[in-house]
């Protein structure tokens, strides 16, 4: 997607991303690759999840596959977009989809690092949900961090929702520990490089 990428050419975009990653790593900085699995599908539509994945695997996701295998593990995050891909998950945006975050990104593509949402106020609006509910759904689906705006009301709402979701078991201890592990591994990797 030219307006948020270096180029629409996946090969060239991968070269540029890897060059930038090298500079961030040399300077011990965390960074994120945006936006998995894509920003927009445009006019594309698919009959099955396999059709959607085949199309994306040959386009936008091909860059992420390369970045996952060629960037030092635990030095970067992947940002999940709020795109909806009905053929893969008819009910959820990518940022709330276990089928996309856990099943596809983590299990099929082998990504074990930090997954961060795009701005959750935007995603909640798109999904017609309260921000707190949207964030809880995203963490349950496999995100580790959520990107918030500076609205203190949103921050308080998210804190309350996450605290309650952990207390009532909506977010399992295993899922919480997994998210914390991803974040700590990134922190440790950065310290090891210094």
Task: State where each predicted segment sits.
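Charged, often glycine-rich, active-site loop that binds/positions anionic groups
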Residues: 1-6
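Second-shell residues forming the walls of enzyme active-site clefts
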Residues: 8-170
């Amino acid at each position: 997607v030219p307006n948020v990428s270096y180029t629409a050419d996946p090969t060239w975009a991968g070269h540029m991303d890897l060059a930038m990653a090298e500079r961030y790593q040399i300077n011990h900085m965390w960074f994120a690759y945006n936006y998995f699995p894509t920003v927009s599908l445009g006019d594309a539509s698919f009959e099955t999840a396999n059709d959607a994945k085949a199309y994306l695997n040959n386009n936008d996701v091909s860059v992420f596959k390369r970045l996952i295998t060629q960037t030092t593990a635990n030095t970067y995050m992947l940002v999940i977009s709020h795109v909806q891909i009905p053929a893969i998950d008819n009910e959820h945006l990518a940022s709330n989809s276990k089928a996309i975050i856990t099943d596809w990104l983590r299990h099929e593509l082998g990504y074990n690092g930090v997954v961060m949402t795009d701005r959750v106020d935007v995603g909640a609006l798109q999904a017609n949900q309260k921000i707190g509910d949207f964030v809880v759904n995203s963490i349950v689906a496999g995100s580790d961090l959520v990107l918030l705006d500076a609205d203190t009301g949103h921050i308080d709402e998210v804190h309350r929702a996450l605290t309650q979701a952990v207390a009532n078991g909506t977010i399992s201890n295993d899922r919480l520990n997994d998210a914390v592990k991803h974040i700590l591994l990134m922190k440790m990797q950065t310290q090891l490089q210094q």
